[in-house]
Amino acid sequence: MMDQARSAISNLFGGEPLSYTRFSLARQVDGDNSHVEMKLAVDEEENTDNNMKASVRKHRRLNGRLCFGTIAVVIFFLIGFMIGYLGYCKRTEQKDCVRLAETETGNSEIIQEENIPQSSRLYWADLKKLLSEKLDAIEFTDTIKQLSQTSREAGSQKDENLAYYIENQFRDFKLSKVWRDEHYVKIQVKGSAAQNAVTIINVNGDSDLVENPGGYVAYSKATTVSGKLIHANFGTKKDFEDLKYPVNGSLVIVRAGKITFAEKVANAQSFNAIGVLIYMDQTKFPVVEAELSLFGHAHLGTGDPYTPGFPSFNHTQFPPSQSSGLPSIPVQTISRKAAEKLFQNMETNCPPSWNTDSLCKLESSQGINVNLSVNNVLKETRILNIFGVIKGFEEPDRYIVVGAQRDAWGPGAAKSSVGTGLLLKLAQAFSDMVSRGGFKPSRSIIFASWSAGDFGAVGATEWLEGYLSSLHLKAFTYINLDKVVLGTRNFKVSASPLLYTLIEKTMQDVRHPIDGKPLYRDSNWISKVEDLSLDNAAFPFLAYSGIPAVSFWFCENEDYPYLDTNLDTYEKLIQKVPQLNKMVRAAAEVAGQFIIKLTHDIELNLDYDMYNNKILSFVKELNQFRADIKAMGLSLQWLYSARGDFFRATSRLTTDFHNAEKTNRFVVREINNRIMKVEYHFLSPYVSPRESPFRHIFWGSGSHTLTALVENLKLRQKNSSAFNETLFRNQLALATWTIQGVANALSGDIWDIDNEF
């Protein structure tokens, strides 16, 4: 074929043969790959001895041949291309005809596949009904009874066995992934060599043993002290301030309740008491058994107090350290019977305003001292946290965490069995809703079983400390299931303001299982929301990690009397709450609706506008001290500006969401990311997480909080010598900048920030 082409070209140009025509399509050095290079090699036998005139004629003839040769080659190339293209089209047309014929003859499989109806997206009404149906089919009390059979102190073999049981249950539920997380922590237990003891020393120096208590207070200082005994009511700061007797160098006895053991001990220590005894009075805790033992812990914080601010993983090389929240004085729980024996050696009746037992006395009789000996020992133990996840269908890297404490000192029916049983049943129900009910959560749901909750949310806090960077802008809500049923009369809640709107909608949807009325009964319910306490596992999520958290429970007007005792049994719980199954089901419906709304809706159900009210309340409180602030040469103008910028940022975010194209996942995700930043950026960036782990300026603890700022300012009027002006100046400046930082984060990108600061 090449010979024929060469012959044709030769004839075209007057029969003069050319050796070859070569095209080079290689990429040139300058990057132009569209250049076509054509080279003509002439016969080497040409006579090179021609004169100048013949040479000129030959070059002209060669240029003409080059031009005509180029045209000929292009024509041949186009003819070949057209022939090939027409042949390809013919084959394609034949194949299309075959396909058309197959379709016309009725290819039933293809038609059937095209006509499969697509499953429609489930909406809120559908999901609410689906959840209710799943919960109706569950018997909760059998699981609670099973879990309450034995004591399961953190790190014990029984605690570990229960962890493996929960892990296997998660696997049986076919969750997307199940895993465990282990930590090596230090907890305090009663010493085996010597018992803890409370003794009365009379005027003659003789001792009379009051009790070797069955319970104890973890993280108490192990020592022996002796001194006068003074009653300090509940041991609140105000109770100590109202005492007519100085507690300096004395032991104090306080009633259980109202605040945590750790706060009672910290207050006593701040007033220079040398030791603390804690008991349950019959007025507040109407327990028949006067010798009932009580358990608690005295760490003013959460997590392992010997690895503050960092996780307790095995073989970590952190230097020895301990939390500043550990007490430097001994503390011990005693029975009501022991307290009454101590009162027999005391004088002066307790004030009627205390509303306590008639036997209550205020101070030791003349010459009578009390000796307290605590011999607790530290024990390093392995604890297991168990996790299971249902992965989201659109944003699996965004998730909520639903958790419950697993361990308990004693049977722990109300303390941890109800929560653990509820955790298991919710995991089962939601797994079934996804696999069979058509529920497709956009975001993931993590179910977590914590250990060492009795020692200050140790398991939960260590997990947060270990994975804080991984959880940032991924975990956006924590739902706590601990102690959700302690009665039937009231429904109470503690939560981040970001969740208030979600809680209100849920209370309007869920009905009380006894009277059938909605849980929402008071339009002013937000003012009655209780702050998360140190002994609540939701607290470190909010105050340490900046993750919005919620804890809720059904209860009576009085405290449940058996928590943290050996009488926290299934039988006692059923006796107090006869319709336990219905109450747990109602709690499951509350938690279930939280889960659905947080994982299903396009926009995160976090109402950032609620913090406008919190900031405004803080500004109003400071305004009461304008004269004092002005006297120091300071102004609140910058705080007003920061508050205004936050308000404008929230308004702009709301507008951005309303104007956003809801089908554009990238845009919606960007808006949700801005919402997720709100809680986190209320963590003060100006304090060390190790020195002040609870950095949240609203809900944390330390001098960086807004509460501490106001308390310091109040001292200027009450006790000017105790007021620290330098500290106040720093507090005001850093609080202002923290609020401004939240406003900036909420605004979005740096070029979107337009503030007046």
UniProtKB/Swiss-Prot annotation:
Phosphotyrosine PTM sites in chain numbering: Y20
Residues found modified as Phosphothreonine: T21
Major place of residence: membrane
Record field: transmembrane: 68-88
Entries under InterPro entries matching the protein: PA_dom_sf, PA_domain, Peptidase_M28, Peptidase_M28B, TFR-like_dimer_dom, TFR-like_dimer_dom_sf, TfR1/2_PA
Motif (Cell attachment site): 643-645
Residues the record lists as Phosphoserine modifications: S10, S19, S24
Localization per Swiss-Prot or TrEMBL: Cell membrane; Melanosome
Region of interest (Ligand-binding), ranges: 566-757
Cytoplasmic side of membrane: 1-67
Keywords: Cell membrane, Disulfide bond, Endocytosis, Glycoprotein, Lipoprotein, Membrane, Palmitate, Phosphoprotein, Receptor, Signal-anchor, Transmembrane, Transmembrane helix
Short sequence motif named Endocytosis signal, residue ranges: 20-23
Glycosylated position list: T103, N248, N314, N719, N724
Positions where lipid (S-palmitoyl cysteine) attaches: C67
Pfam family, one: Peptidase_M28
SUPFAM superfamilies on file: PA domain (SSF52025), Transferrin receptor-like dimerisation domain (SSF47672), Zn-dependent exopeptidases (SSF53187)
Gene Ontology CC entries for this record: external side of plasma membrane; melanosome; recycling endosome
Keyword check for Phosphoprotein: yes
PTM: Stearoylated by ZDHHC6 which inhibits TFRC-mediated activation of the JNK pathway and promotes mitochondrial fragmentation. Stearoylation does not affect iron uptake. N- and O-glycosylated, phosphorylated and palmitoylated.
Domain of life: Eukaryota
Side Extracellular, residues: 89-757
Family assignment from sequence similarity: Belongs to the peptidase M28 family. M28B subfamily.
Stated role: Cellular uptake of iron occurs via receptor-mediated endocytosis of ligand-occupied transferrin receptor into specialized endosomes. Endosomal acidification leads to iron release. The apotransferrin-receptor complex is then recycled to the cell surface with a return to neutral pH and the concomitant loss of affinity of apotransferrin for its receptor. Transferrin receptor is necessary for development of erythrocytes and the nervous system. Positively regulates T and B cell proliferation through iron uptake.
PANTHER family, per database record: N-ACETYLATED-ALPHA-LINKED ACIDIC DIPEPTIDASE, TRANSFERRIN RECEPTOR PROTEIN 1
Name of the molecule in the record: Transferrin receptor protein 1
Lineage, highest ranks first: Eukaryota, Metazoa, Chordata, Craniata, Vertebrata
Gene: TFRC
